[in-house]
Amino acid sequence: MEANIINGKAIAEDITGTLATCINDLKLQYSLVPCLIVVLVGDDPASHLYVRNKQRKAEMLGLRSETILLPSTTSESSLIDKIHELNNDDNVHGILVQLPVPKHIDKNLIINTIDPRKDVDGFHNDNVGRLFTGQKRNCLIPCTPRGCLYLIKTVTHNLSGSDAVVIGRSNIVGKPMACLLLGENCTVTTVHSATRNLSDYCSKADILVAAVGIPNFVKSSWIKPGAIVIDVGINSVEEDGVKKFVGDVNFAEAKNVASAITPVPGGVGPMTIAFLMVNTVMAACNQSGIENFVEKYLDL
């Protein structure tokens, strides 16, 4: 039997549709308009595309949004000065520095210069520390893993006792994903490039999250029949002279083994942007002393 194809695009649209109502009510009840500022250094075409998509979605939802474009020659100190300026602006609730930044700039220094209350990517050490110590209600959670967990819960809400395997150990997806699954009482294994017999671990997983950045890396023979498969990868490949995007999982094979699987595109990607918007609204509420407002609209 073919797997349930988890329509991340439709689910993300449901989330943002509800969030738009939340934002409108926030304006009516508190005269608060959440504001997201994206800082983009350099002229990487993919980064510019991502930023345009984020800004378009923010404006559609009724957020204030602005993109600050800086040349690739921008010094680290100049970027830090700009972030301090945004940190000190009470009208700015969310700050995102689009990654990657040019090589002469220390990415971690920049991330940790952002006020953690405004760190809508959820990458600041304060937010990471709170997440990893079980304080997810008191931090901003990285958008992609948060979106992945939401997708998993559309298939089964009770994850307690499930065996989960996360392929990848990045700070952006792999590590926080493992942490979120632990928080749901899963038994979590993280595998990576140095893992021996990686497929053996995958084949025992009730929940398999692939975030490795290698096209069609996960074969159907690695997947436990009936598993939930979340494919975070988005890789550009060329087939018969035509470029297309594929995930880290061999979708054509895997959909005949898994019980539920995300497609690429249209799976995890839209959820990342949706939860960036959620984080921005939550950040605005937190900075304004408005407690649990977003949670009245969305089951987070």
Swiss-Prot record:
InterPro entries hit by this protein: Aminoacid_DH-like_N_sf, NAD(P)-bd_dom_sf, THF_DH/CycHdrlase, THF_DH/CycHdrlase_cat_dom, THF_DH/CycHdrlase_CS, THF_DH/CycHdrlase_NAD-bd_dom
Catalysed reactions, as listed in the record: (6R)-5,10-methylene-5,6,7,8-tetrahydrofolate + NADP(+) = (6R)-5,10-methenyltetrahydrofolate + NADPH; (6R)-5,10-methenyltetrahydrofolate + H2O = (6R)-10-formyltetrahydrofolate + H(+)
GO molecular function, one term: methenyltetrahydrofolate cyclohydrolase activity
Record PANTHER family: C-1-TETRAHYDROFOLATE SYNTHASE, CYTOPLASMIC (PTHR48099:SF5), C-1-TETRAHYDROFOLATE SYNTHASE, CYTOPLASMIC-RELATED (PTHR48099)
Entry superkingdom: Bacteria
Assembly and interaction partners: Homodimer.
Summary of the function given for this chain in its UniProt record: Catalyzes the oxidation of 5,10-methylenetetrahydrofolate to 5,10-methenyltetrahydrofolate and then the hydrolysis of 5,10-methenyltetrahydrofolate to 10-formyltetrahydrofolate.
Gene Ontology cellular component terms for the protein in this record: cytosol
Pathway(s) it belongs to: One-carbon metabolism; tetrahydrofolate interconversion
Residues noted as binding NADP(+) in the record, renumbered to the chain: 168-170, 193, 234
Tagged with keyword Oxidoreductase: yes
GO annotation, biological process: L-histidine biosynthetic process; methionine biosynthetic process; purine nucleotide biosynthetic process; tetrahydrofolate interconversion
E.C. designation(s): 1.5.1.5, 3.5.4.9
Gene name of this polypeptide: folD
Keyword terms: Amino-acid biosynthesis, Histidine biosynthesis, Hydrolase, Methionine biosynthesis, Multifunctional enzyme, NADP, One-carbon metabolism, Oxidoreductase, Purine biosynthesis
This protein's name: Bifunctional protein FolD
Signal peptide: none
Origin species: Ehrlichia canis (strain Jake)
Family statement: Belongs to the tetrahydrofolate dehydrogenase/cyclohydrolase family.
